[in-house]
Amino acid sequence: MTWTTPDLCDRFPEVAVAEPLFRHFGGRTTFSGPIATVRCVEDNSRIRELASTPGDGRVLVVDGQGSLRQALFGDQIGAQAVANGWAGVLIHGCVRDVEILAGLPLGVLALAACPRRTERRDLGDVDVPVNFAGVAFVPGHWLYADANGVVVAATPLSLEIAGVEH
């Protein structure tokens, strides 16, 4: 049985729902997994580092402070994330190389596209709680994303256990 974010919201009213700010850029529009976080401003050093580690089906949530001046994520980091088993990324900022990202088997949500890359200054924080789009994203909590939106829960959700019928 597959899930949708509307079904999750109906069955689990306690879930947090992100404000509808994000566009899909990846080859997968439906993805979920435990959250890992990065907080950075126009420096993707920590994103690159984390994407090169085993993802184990996690979702990388990046608080880029909503900057639209530089892209935090592109084809190279996207390819690393796929190779290392990440389920997807949610970026409060920009991506680039959108034609290539669209062909990757990876969920990619971001505010917009920007062709300018970041500078790498080795700055940023990993695995810290971040807040944007009206939601607290906590490492280890679960993110569910599809064409309807983004939902966050403290624990994994299962519609099969919940007995929801379609």
From Swiss-Prot:
GO annotation terms (biological process): regulation of RNA metabolic process
Q: Which Gene3D superfamilies match?
A: Ribonuclease E inhibitor RraA/RraA-like (3.50.30.40)
- The molecule here is called Putative 4-hydroxy-4-methyl-2-oxoglutarate aldolase
Residue sites binding a divalent metal cation per the record: 97
Q: Which family does it belong to?
A: Belongs to the class II aldolase/RraA-like family.
- Give the cofactor note: Divalent metal cation.
Q: How does it assemble?
A: Homotrimer.
